[in-house]
């Protein structure tokens, strides 16, 4: 397994190449259609999540600028959640050029090339839903169970990482209020994502299958200041 992962990482590590590109080249609008692909083996949601986390955690260590990687990650999440307008705004705001209208090949304003693997843009067609197993054994825990709190890792689209006191029974709506109180970010400007999925206010953490070491992404959508 390690050999396969190592080979895949090597194949996708042209990501922040020094390949230079002349400015003023072709720049296509971001396409709305999501890439369709099939994994070599049926992949669970957890495996896909781990694969994506590995890429995003290591990509900035290679060529390219961290702020561009952060923008590409936010754009990829928005695009997978069918928020094409937000994804395009993120790309435009970071001055990212798309020669083919896809995040699989991008350039920053300095001409550095960035390549995103397809698994960061869409789940495979043979993805195994972990939710189905839970539905078969749907035994709600009694409300009398002791509430166990932990430090939830949250990463803002601004690049800031922070922690919130949370329990698995907390709803996203409740956590949004906590983030608002802690960081002064209006609830209406918060969009919470996990494993490429938009989390609604009524969603509970236990429904997301999140574990303590995982990170929830929060896109902060605030109006740009007038110049």
Swiss-Prot record:
Listed Basic and acidic residues bias regions: 1-14, 25-39
Pfam families: UBD, ubiquitin
Region Disordered, annotated ranges: 1-45
Alphabetized Gene3D superfamilies for the sequence: Phosphatidylinositol 3-kinase Catalytic Subunit, Chain A, domain 1 (3.10.20.90), Ub domain-containing protein, DC-UbP/UBTD2, N-terminal domain (1.20.225.20)
InterPro entries linked to this entry: DC-UbP/UBTD2_N, DC-UbP/UBTD2_N_sf, Ubiquitin-like_dom, Ubiquitin-like_domsf, UBTD1/2
Comp. bias (Basic residues): 15-24
Superkingdom of this protein's organism: Eukaryota
Domain Ubiquitin-like intervals: 150-225
Entry function: May be involved in the regulation of cellular senescence through a positive feedback loop with TP53.
PANTHER family attached to this UniProt entry: UBIQUITIN DOMAIN CONTAINING 1 PROTEIN-RELATED
Name recorded for this polypeptide: Ubiquitin domain-containing protein 1
Organism annotation: Danio rerio
Gene: ubtd1
